[in-house]
Structure formats: structure tokens, C-alpha cells
Amino acid sequence: MDVEKLNLDNIISRLLEVRGSKPGKNVQLTESEIKGLCQKSREIFLSQPILLELEAPLKICGDVHGQYYDLLRLFEYGGFPPESNYLFLGDYVDRGKQSLETICLLLAYKIKYPENFFLLRGNHECASINRIYGFYDECKRRYNIKLWKTFTDCFNCLPVAAIIDEKIFCCHGGLSPDLQSMEQIRRIMRPTDVPDQGLLCDLLWSDPDKDVTGWGENDRGVSFTFGPEVVAKFLHKHDLDLICRAHQVVEDGYEFFAKRQLVTLFSAPNYCGEFDNAGSMMTVDETLMCSFQILKPADKKKYPYGAGGVGSNRPVTPPRNAPAAQPKKGAKK
């Protein structure tokens, strides 16, 4: 399909048609429509900086992981675009049952509102990861492997960090021992895969750890953990107020670290149908005051989200030091 002929409004309205339906109902766009979404959004990502400079007010969301009906709930709470400006912190695909609907709606909104709707890259927007954790299988089952490769080309062009009003630094994972200047992020060339070490890897993979002084080993086997004083030094050096990141399940959907100098956001409630966590969205107003909207874990009988679906036999990325968000009894880790 010629990208210029992409009927965006029609695509968005079909994706939104399932609002109010029983969760799990699929929306089957045509292959050429999805290809068009990937190609057009890729052009937009490349036309915008890899380190976005954004202005408040806006709403920030953490991991969604293919939980499409929860994404719709987020928009119902926060206002469907263009009613509010949005920044998503990555991890759109894998684990949940409807990665395709999730990523297609997000890409469609990016194309429709390029200056008001922003998507960062998460560690799952990477071929070697989403090959394993569900997205590849969903593409293969519902379309074909070629389409999965088209998504890979798109994901390789996503921006990796954002700064809001020169005060709030946002990325998917966290800080890097290699990060001395913002210019280093700006110099990362796209398209690019995510390497298994170095600055880009750390921005997408690292985690805060209250028990670490400086930098520590990461249980994920990738990147590092960083302690509270690393956060304080980074903020002071770059004249920032807050780091906002995602990447870890937290029980209340948001969790502060290092005297409220860092916040973790997670926007997939009942993650994988195995956790009892809430999801949340952070609203940043014009004065940079931050508040949280909470998506409570849905009633299981009413909303059988992830239970037993795609990903039910896949290991969940373990939350670090978050005993409150452990799986329910009998759930697979």
C-alpha cells in the first residue's frame, strides 16, 4: 500500500471499535495497512531527534506489553489523543495476547499526532527479545514472518530518551556508567539494533537498586544496577529534577526511589495474568507537578486478560526487590 493512501482515521476507528467488547476480541487490519503504519511512523521517528525535548503538560505511561484492553483503559482515563499529550516509555509488545493491536494503535496515533504523541524504545522493541517472548509468534500466527521483520525495521528507528522541560529525564530502563553528556545520546545513529552492552543497552536495560553503592551487577544478566547516589549525582550534574523510567513490575503501578528523585512506572495491570499489580500513568502539569492515575487490577472473572494466553508458559521478567508484587499462589514465575 502506498503510505500516502493510508486511511488513518479508518484504521484508528476500527482499532477503537472493540471498546466495550469483552477483552480479547481481535482487530485484524490488512497486512498492507500494518506495513504502511510501520513505514510512515519510521519516517517520523527518523525526522525527530533520538533524544526528544518535550514540553509539559503530558501523560507518561510505562510498559504495556500487548495488554490492548488495558491500553484502551489508559486512554479512557487520560483522554484519547489529541485530548492529552502522551509519552510512552517502551515495551509495547510481548507477553500479552494482543501485541499487534497495541503497537498498531500507538503507531497510528504517532502518525496522526506527530507533535503530541511520543513513543520511546523499550528493551522488547528489539528483534532478539521479541523473537522469544511472544511478538514473533503472534506475527507468524496472524500474518507472516515478513511482517515481523517490517516491525523490526520500524523499532530500530525509535527514539531512546526524552527530556521534559529540561527537568525530567525519561527512558525505558535507566542510567549508564558510560553516560557523561546528553550529546552521547544524540550521537547514536539510527537505524540501530540494541547492542548487548554500552550506552544504548543500558538506557533500555538498567535498573535502580537501593542496596547498591555505585554500579552493580544486574540479575537480568544484561547491563547494570545503580544506587541512589548515582541518581543524585546524575541529576545534579545535568540540572535535572527527576528520572522517569519503566522496565520493572511495581505493585502500585508507580514506585519512587532515591528520595523521590526517580520514579518507576508500569502500566500493565495484572501483568501477564500472574501478578496482582496495578498499572499507572503519570500526569505532568505545566508547573511540572506530577500526579498518578491508577488502573486497578481488573476483576479476573470479568476480564480474563493474560491468564493462560500467549506468554503463560514464558518466564516473567522478575521484579527486583519488589516482594509485594510477587505472583499469586500457583502462578508460574
Swiss-Prot record:
State a GO cellular component annotated for this protein.
nuclear membrane
Which cofactors are reported in the record for this sequence? Answer: Mn(2+)
Q: Which UniProt keywords apply?
A: Cell cycle, Cell division, Chromatin regulator, Cytoplasm, Developmental protein, Hydrolase, Manganese, Meiosis, Metal-binding, Mitosis, Nucleus, Protein phosphatase
Which residues fall in a compositionally biased region of kind Low complexity?
322-333
Q: Which parts of the sequence bind Mn(2+) 2?
A: 63, 91, 123, 172, 247
Q: In which tissues is it expressed?
A: Expressed in gonads, nervous system, intestine and muscles.
Tell me where the transmembrane regions lie.
none
Residues given in the record as Mn(2+) 1 binding sites: 63, 65, 91
Which residues are annotated as active site?
124
Query: What EC number(s) does the entry state?
Result: 3.1.3.16
GO biological process terms, semicolon-separated: cell division; chromatin organization; meiotic cell cycle
**Family membership noted in the UniProt record:** Belongs to the PPP phosphatase family. PP-1 subfamily.
Known function: Serine/threonine-protein phosphatase essential for chromosomal dynamics during meiosis and mitosis. During meiosis, promotes chromosomal cohesion and germline immortality via a small RNA-mediated genome silencing pathway. Antagonizes the function of air-2 kinase during meiosis I and mitosis to promote chromatid cohesion and spindle attachment. Dephosphorylates histone H3 at 'Ser-10'. Dephosphorylates histone H3 at 'Thr-3'. Also involved in the activation of chloride channel clh-3 during cell swelling and meiotic maturation.
What PANTHER family does its record include? SERINE/THREONINE PROTEIN PHOSPHATASE, SERINE_THREONINE-PROTEIN PHOSPHATASE
The protein here is known as Serine/threonine-protein phosphatase PP1-beta
- In its UniProt entry, the species of origin is given as Caenorhabditis elegans
Classification lineage: Eukaryota, Metazoa, Ecdysozoa, Nematoda, Chromadorea
